[in-house]
C-alpha cells in the first residue's frame, strides 16, 4: 500500500548516502560534546533537506509529508540529533507559518530555513506541558505592537535557532482574546526583551540545546502575529494541527534510531560466539529478532499511513497512534538490542547505550504516550475530554453525582 515511488526511492538513497557518509561518523562526537553540529547542518542545507515542504515559489521543493518522513528516518538512523534537526526544519513551526501565515511571514520564515536555520516552536511552560492551553505567557496589545511577558520551557534549539514561533495569551485593553502565535527572529542584534535562559541538559539527542526562554516586555509588531478570520480561539486549534505533522516526524526519528540499533544488534549476533557457536543460533535470540522486525515494520507502515492522511496536516488520531507505537517500539527495540551485547552494551564505548538514551525522549516530547492515548480515546468514544485543570475537577465532580 505504501510502496515508494521511483522519485521517493531516489530521495531515500540521497538522504541515506549523506547520512551514512557524513553524519554517522560524527554521531558519537555530537553526543559527547553536546554541541550543535553546525557543519552537519550546513551540509543538510546544501543537500536541500531543509525546508523541503516549502512551496517552490519561495525556494522550497514542494515535497510531501511522506517524502519528508522518509528522509527523517534515514537521518535519524545515522544520528538522532540530525534526525531531530530535519524534523524541526521541515515540520511544526515552519509548517504552521507556511499554511496560516501572511506572504511576508512565509517569506521571512522560508529565507531563514533555506539558509540553514532550525526554527524553535515555543509552547511549553514550567506549569503548562501536556495542558498547553494553561500557558500563562501573555501578549498585551499596545498600539501597533504586542508586548510579551512570561517564560517558556524545554525550547528545542534555544540559543541556536533564529526563527521563533511563540504562543501566548493575547489581551486587548485587558480583555483576553485567546491564544495567539507570534513570529520573532533572534540574532546578534536582539530583539530586546528576549532572553535565552539556562540550558536543560538532556539524557539523549544531546546535540540540540534545550533551554528556558524568558520574555521581558518583548515587543513584536502586529504584522508578525498569525491572524485568523474566525478569531484566535479557532486559530489556536488550527495552529496546533501543525503539531500532527511534527508528531509523525518525531515518530520517524524514533524509528530511525531503533532501526540502527536493530541492524547493529543483528550484526553482533552473527559474529559473536558463545558456547562454541554464534549467538544467532540460539532460538531465544532468534525470536527476539523476529519480534523486533515485526514491530519496526509495523511502526514504519503506521507512520507512512499517518503521513498521507488528512488534507493539510496528518489526521490527528493517525498521527497520535503512529507516534505512540513508533516511540514505544523504539524504546523496546533499543533495549532488546542492548541486551544482545550483554555487559558490553551497557558500556559507554558501545553505541547501544546512546541509542537507548536517544530513543527515550520520544514517549515524552511532542505529546506523552499517555496524553496521546487520552486524545485517541476521546476521538474513538466521541467525547470531548477536559484539557484544563478546572475541566478535570468539574468532570470528577459530575461523575460522583
From Swiss-Prot:
Enzyme Commission number(s): 3.13.1.4
Coiled coil spans: none
Enzyme class: hydrolase
Cofactor: FAD
Site (Important for activity): 84
Residues given in the record as substrate binding sites: 243-244
Protein name as catalogued: 3-sulfinopropanoyl-CoA desulfinase
Natural source organism: Advenella mimigardefordensis (strain DSM 17166 / LMG 22922 / DPN7)
Gene: acd
